[in-house]
Each structure stands twice: as C-alpha cells, then as structure tokens.
Amino acid sequence: MMRWNFSPEDLSSIFRNNSTLPKITVKNVDIEFTIPTAVTIEVEPSPVQQDNPPISSEQADFSLAQPDSPSLPLESPEESESSAQQEATAQTPNPPKEVEPSPVQQEFPAEPTEPAKEVEPSATQQEASGHPLKSTKEVNPPPKQEIPAQPSEPPEKVELSPVLQQAPTQLLEPLKKVECSPVQQAVPAQSSEPSIVVEPSPVQQIAHLCLQSSLRKWNPL
C-alpha cells in the first residue's frame, strides 16, 4: 500500500496550477426544523375496549355495593332445619306417609276359620253362580302379608288376586260341605293356589256300586 502525504501548501499549489478544475460554489441552505414543544400522542382504542361499553358511575357504585351484601340470605335455625328435612324427604323415593292395610288383609284375619261372609261377588262370580259347577273348589286364603317398616310405595290401589276374582259364590258356603281327604287338607295349608276336590261322575259311581255288590256276593261277610 502506497501512502501519499500532502501538506496543505501542496494542495493549494495543486489547485492553483490546475485550471481544468471546475469552479464550485457552495451555497448555504437554510434548513428549518420545527420541533413541537408538546408531543400529542393519539392512542386508538383496541376492538376489545370498543366492545366493552363505558360503565357509568351509578353502575360502578352498585357493583361496589354488591360484595358487601351476602350471596345467600341468612336463614334462621328453624328454617334451616325445615329445609334439611325437606331435602331428606326429597331424597327418599316414597316416604311412608300413611300405610293403610290392604283389603285382602282386612277381609282375612290372622287365623281364618271360616270364609268371609261380607265379600260381595264380582261380575264373574255372579255369572258363575248362574251355571253351577259340578266340582267343588276349596279356596284357602293367602297368608297375612307383613307390612314393611318403610314400604317403597304406599298401597294406594290394591287389586284383588285372580283367585278371588275367579272364585264362584261357593266361597259363601261353609267349608263343612266340602269333603276332602286328610292328605289334601295338609298339603294346601301353605300354598296360595286352591285345592280342587273332584267328585266321581255318575258312571263311576254306578261302576263302583256294581263292584261292591259283586264283592258282597262273593264275600257275604
């Protein structure tokens, strides 16, 4: 690298001797800078701020007064106990309000000896009484049902069992007229279904009498 060192005198001599250089005139340009004393900053509100309407002073006072008031009104101990009882009753599916004995329990006592005489025959029983059957039916009353301490549903409507609906008017007659063997008397004691005693037909009775007469002829004793 070559370095040229020129003094100011050398430079002046060069510029003076060289006439080919153009003349350069420098003009002072007046530049004015206007600097404002107070800077005004314009801030545009964001869209989130535009969506929220301005809150008036009354609304602000009301919102400030709200935290002072309790969220839930205070209740007296009696009302709180009653509300707790209402919630407890609402949680139970069906509270045992009034348990009425069913008509089946009212008609049949704990140890029935004779059928209930106050039972009114239904329409099917009246029709059956018009056409009496040959076979006599012995209907044992169902055992007394025990009432639970807290029934799931109160017995509002109790329908009669199909045994009582289908039984003819022979229920009104005493059980003395019904003849049954000791085996038949012992078996249906625990069963709810009626025991049927079938009487022999006239043909069977005649055949039985003929056999007895023939046996008597052979055995006069």
From Swiss-Prot:
Sequence segments annotated as region (Disordered): 40-162
InterPro entries: LRRC37 (IPR015753), LRRC37_N (IPR032754)
Polar residues: compositionally biased ranges: 47-60
Pfam families, per database record: LRRC37 (PF15779)
Compositional bias segments (type: Low complexity): 82-92
Identification of the protein by name: Putative uncharacterized protein FLJ43944
Originating organism: Homo sapiens
